[in-house]
């Protein structure tokens, strides 16, 4: 247990340092890129009171809408927001994996690991939504838009919320674990949909790996991604250790009382 906690603390520290370093690189060494333009109708531009710089004439569409250059601030949020979102998908996948393991093996430890992974994934989803709102405001001039990526990600957050409500509404431990595992797997289907939807149907949300990132931008992005995953794994490991300690104490307490 001590080794597990020590490993988690080291991962947390290294992950925090990598994330901080990536954010500093984003401000001081990364090339400022506009990541293209954002397209708004005249009504949207007026409603959002946008102050974005109008894109050059050769980038203007012929359908009457207006293209604006994305401001530099959206690029800085990008180094924090995208790694959070990628980590949330990954941790959600871990939760679904342990849910499948529980249904096949019926071992309580798999349900515990699935629940804790869901807790960590939910934490990352909330952080992604907050930074995403800041990005949306900076990039599109509005706090929210029913864009396919945003909508499917919001659905994913709500499904996670329902997962915890479901767990708390069932008293029987075995039934609770079984229903929660089934729901976790069904809810996880939304994760790949949300991840790939910008590649399938038209969306304002940029596709990161098709954005032509310069090497000075790619390095801090990868560093931030690694750091964020390390932080996520550290939180997960600490929570698993805490839960295992609590379960051991309950076993000892029951043994003493009997």
Regions picked out by a protein language model, each given a short descriptive name:
Residues 1-258:
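Polytopic transmembrane helical bundles with strong interfacial aromatic enrichment
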């Amino acid at each position: 247990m001590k080794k597990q906690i020590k490993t988690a603390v080291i991962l947390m520290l290294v992950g925090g340092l990598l994330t901080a370093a990536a954010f500093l690189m984003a401000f001081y060494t990364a090339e400022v890129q506009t990541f293209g333009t954002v397209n708004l109708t005249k009504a949207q531009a007026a409603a959002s009171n946008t102050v974005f710089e109008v894109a050059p004439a050769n980038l203007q569409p012929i359908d009457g809408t207006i293209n604006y250059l994305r401001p530099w601030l959206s690029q800085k949020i990008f180094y924090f927001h995208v790694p959070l979102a990628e980590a949330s998908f990954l941790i959600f996948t871990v939760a679904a994996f342990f849910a499948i393991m529980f249904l096949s093996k019926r071992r309580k430890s798999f349900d515990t690991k699935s629940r804790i992974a869901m807790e960590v994934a939910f934490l990352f989803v909330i952080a992604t939504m907050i930074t995403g709102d800041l990005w949306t405001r900076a990039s599109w001039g509005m706090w929210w838009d029913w864009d396919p990526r945003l909508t499917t990600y919001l659905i994913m957050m709500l499904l996670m919320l329902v997962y915890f409500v479901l767990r708390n509404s069932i008293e029987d431990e075995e039934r609770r674990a079984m229903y929660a595992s089934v729901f976790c797997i069904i809810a996880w289907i939304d994760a790949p949909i949300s991840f790939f939807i910008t590649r399938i149907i038209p969306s304002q949300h940029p596709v990161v790996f098709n954005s032509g990132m310069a090497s000075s931008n790619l390095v801090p992005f990868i560093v931030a991604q690694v750091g964020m995953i390390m932080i996520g794994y550290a939180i997960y490991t600490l929570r698993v250790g805490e839960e295992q300690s609590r379960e051991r104490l309950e076993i000892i307490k029951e043994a003493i009382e009997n």
